C-alpha cells in the first residue's frame, strides 16, 4: 500500500495480493481519520460480497474468484465506539462473461491495482444498532 496525503484527504494505491478492507483500516488507524468518504476502481481476483436480507436482518456472503474489474467501490469511514468502521459497497464485473455482482464489500484481494480516494470530513458521526432495521445506522 502506498498513499499520499492532500488537503482534502488521501490518494491510495494497492498492489497485487493486498486486501482492500484491511489496508483501508490500517490507513484510517495510522492517520486517525474520523469521518470520510471512499471512491475507488481497480481489479480483484478474490472478492466476498454480502447481501443484506431485510426480512432475516442478516447478511448472506457470496465469494467470487477469478478476474474481476472493480467498476465501482463507494462508501464511508466513521468511528463506532472509537474504532474504525467501514461501510463499503462494491460492483464487480467479469470482462469475459459479462457477469456483474454488487453488494456490501466484506473482503477483496487485488489482482492488478486499486486506485482509491479517501475524502476526509471535519467532525464525527457514530453508528448505533437499530433493532427495527437490523443494521448499525448513523448516529448524529
Regions found by a protein language model. Give the residues of each.
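N-terminal intrinsically disordered, cationic/polar leader segments
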Residues: 1-86, 91-140
Amino acid at each position: 500500500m502506498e498513499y499520499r496525503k492532500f488537503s482534502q484527504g488521501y490518494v491510495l494505491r494497492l498492489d497485487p495480493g493486498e486486501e482492500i478492507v484491511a489496508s483501508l483500516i490500517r490507513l484510517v488507524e495510522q492517520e486517525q481519520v474520523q469521518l470520510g468518504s471512499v471512491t475507488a476502481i481497480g481489479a480483484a481476483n478474490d472478492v466476498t460480497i454480502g447481501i443484506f436480507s431485510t426480512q432475516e436482518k442478516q447478511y448472506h456472503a457470496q465469494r467470487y474468484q477469478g478476474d474481476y474489474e472493480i467498476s465501482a467501490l463507494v462508501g464511508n469511514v466513521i468511528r463506532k465506539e472509537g474504532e474504525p468502521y467501514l461501510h463499503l459497497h462494491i460492483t464487480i464485473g467479469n470482462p469475459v462473461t459479462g457477469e456483474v455482482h454488487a453488494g456490501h464489500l466484506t473482503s477483496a484481494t487485488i489482482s492488478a491495482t486499486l486506485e482509491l480516494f479517501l475524502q476526509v470530513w471535519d467532525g464525527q458521526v457514530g453508528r448505533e444498532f437499530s433493532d427495527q432495521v437490523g443494521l448499525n445506522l448513523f448516529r448524529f
